């Protein structure tokens, strides 16, 4: 017993040491929280002074919140920045907003959007001049980093960068309904400039490539756009790739949105997840980086129709579908984070969904550990492992609210407890303890409403060893990503230095030739 206690003590000491080390570099452990939200309408930004707003988001364990910094509103004249502006819902004070978010445990993601309104342009003949745009963006990004760097770690450069309307707002900031062909070459230059400006202020900052969508024009498909950025040697200039989904118009298992039909190397049978996985495959094929998938929401009319079919309320359907979609994108789409659309005025997400969000933020935060599928094509039981335990999200895709038996295997050595996805509490006493048979199986009743299952190892030694193993694996992934980013940045810096050296040598050579030519001319003319 004494030897066991000594071993446990050593393990705990080592774990504590690792924890302290990792805490000194939080980016190593980045990605623990699997979800986030985006304040697309700007309502939260204009109402952050109301304590109830951020208290609600804090209670939901929001994690990260995307907030736009509209270029045309904060820099109306070159170099004159005002971090307060008006939007459709009131006054926004970005300094106060980011500070408040941090105090509520929410990491802001500052999204640099729009274009410089003060640069000369005329739609559609003349966009803003390229060199002026690049110079202005570097100034804008640097000023924002200096102003908010103590509160903002994450920076997204642009929004919907492969969308003609969004790109039109960059090149023709003052034109209404401007359209412009997306330009990954120009965006790559913008990305490099913003990266250098922000990293110069704080090298620990995390840069996101801005919100790739799934367009109808396959030339600008996220996979093709990523390759174009890589071809411009700008792969080092971002740390995370972000996707922006359209509003989904059917259930999570059937929703489709990629008109180009680009498929991943391995199909899951879930169209939405397969479309995202295809982008993840492209991302990893070029150079592995995390993938955040944003703007998750469902069509309001579809939610109403589904609710009427099953004699329930749209908020309940939304809560269930958001949970199922989040798990599917994490499991089969390789999404490191799934970002929900936040629109409080339209009850998105509703109170039920917010509770579900809070539960999922801890229950699907681990690594995807496989799918325990019962003997049915309409059933899912997705397994996530982290923190020394195994969590599952299980549901049927048919049958409505009628519960049917489900058998899940692989639970030997665990003490599983089941909860509804929107349960008010995840304490064991508030769940249903599930007995494990001799074959490691558990049985429970499940409907289209997803069920959370949390399994802790029965043995304390196994609990400790699994917790350490999970934390080490997570930290290892973080360190590999961090090392990869650092190496890419060093290569880029070296290339820039070589380019600068070559330019200087070329200038020196040209100057020497010019002087020699002048001497020869003067000598030929008898002027020497």
Say what each PLM segment does.
Residues 24-70:
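Boundary/entry segment of secreted carbohydrate-active catalytic domains
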Residues 60-80, 89-219, 242-251:
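Substrate-binding cleft and catalytic face of glycoside hydrolase catalytic domains
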Residues 432-474:
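C-terminal beta-strand-rich structural cap/linker in extracellular carbohydrate-active enzymes
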Residues 183-319, 332:
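Noncatalytic carbohydrate-binding groove/subsite architecture in carbohydrate-active enzymes
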Residues 375-419:
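Carbohydrate-binding surface patches
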Residues 47-58, 134-144, 220-232, 318-326:
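Short, acidic/polar
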Residues 293-364, 368-377:
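Aromatic/acidic polysaccharide-binding cleft in carbohydrate-active enzymes
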Residues 1-13:
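N-terminal Sec-pathway targeting helices
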């Amino acid at each position: 017993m004494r030897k066991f206690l000594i071993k446990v003590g050593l393990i705990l000491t080592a774990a504590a040491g690792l924890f302290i080390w990792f805490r000194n570099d939080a980016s190593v452990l980045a990605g623990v929280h699997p979800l986030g939200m985006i304040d697309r309408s700007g309502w939260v930004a204009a109402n952050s002074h109301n304590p109830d707003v951020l208290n609600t988001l804090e209670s939901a364990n929001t994690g990260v919140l995307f907030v736009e910094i509209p270029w045309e509103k904060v820099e109306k004249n070159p170099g004159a920045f005002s971090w307060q502006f008006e939007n459709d819902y009131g006054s926004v004070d970005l300094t106060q907003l980011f500070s408040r978010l941090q105090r509520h445990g929410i990491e802001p993601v500052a999204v640099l959007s729009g274009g410089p309104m003060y640069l000369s342009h005329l739609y559609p003949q003349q966009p803003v001049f390229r060199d002026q745009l690049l110079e202005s963006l570097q100034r804008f990004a640097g000023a924002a980093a200096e102003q908010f760097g103590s509160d903002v770690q994450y920076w997204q450069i642009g929004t919907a960068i492969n969308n003609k309307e969004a790109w039109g707002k960059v090149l023709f900031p003052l034109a209404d309904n401007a359209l412009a062909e997306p330009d990954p070459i120009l965006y790559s230059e913008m990305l490099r400039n913003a990266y250098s400006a922000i990293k110069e202020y704080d090298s620990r900052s995390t840069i996101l490539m801005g919100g790739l969508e799934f367009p109808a024009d396959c030339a600008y498909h996220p996979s093709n756009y990523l390759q174009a950025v890589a071809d411009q040697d700008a792969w080092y200039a971002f740390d995370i790739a972000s996707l922006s989904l359209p509003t989904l118009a059917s259930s999570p298992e059937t929703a489709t949105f990629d008109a180009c039909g680009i498929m991943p190397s391995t199909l899951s049978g879930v169209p939405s997840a397969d479309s995202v996985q295809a982008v993840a495959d492209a991302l990893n094929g070029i150079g592995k980086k995390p993938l955040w998938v944003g703007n998750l929401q469902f069509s309001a009319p579809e939610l109403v129709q589904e609710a009427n079919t099953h004699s329930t309320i749209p908020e309940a359907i939304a809560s269930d579908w958001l949970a199922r979609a989040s798990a599917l994108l994490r499991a089969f789409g390789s999404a490191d984070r799934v970002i929900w659309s936040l629109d409080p005025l339209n009850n998105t997400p509703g109170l039920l969904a917010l509770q579900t969000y809070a539960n999922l933020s801890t229950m699907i935060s681990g690594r995807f550990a496989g799918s325990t599928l019962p003997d049915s094509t309409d059933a899912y039981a997705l397994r996530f492992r982290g923190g020394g335990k195994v969590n599952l999200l299980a549901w049927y895709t048919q049958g409505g609210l009628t519960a049917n038996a489900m058998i899940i295997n692989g639970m030997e050595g665990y003490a599983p407890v089941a909860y509804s996805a929107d349960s008010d509490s995840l304490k064991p006493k508030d769940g249903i303890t599930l007995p494990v048979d001799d074959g490691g199986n558990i049985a429970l009743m499940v409907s289209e409403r997803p069920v959370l299952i949390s399994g802790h190892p029965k043995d304390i030694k196994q609990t400790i060893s699994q917790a350490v193993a999970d934390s080490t694996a997570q930290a290892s992934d973080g360190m590999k990503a961090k090392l990869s980013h650092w190496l890419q940045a060093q290569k880029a810096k070296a290339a820039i230095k070589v380019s600068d050296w070559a330019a200087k040598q070329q200038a020196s050579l040209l100057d020497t030739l010019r002087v020699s030519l002048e001497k020869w001319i003067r000598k030929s003319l008898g002027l020497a």
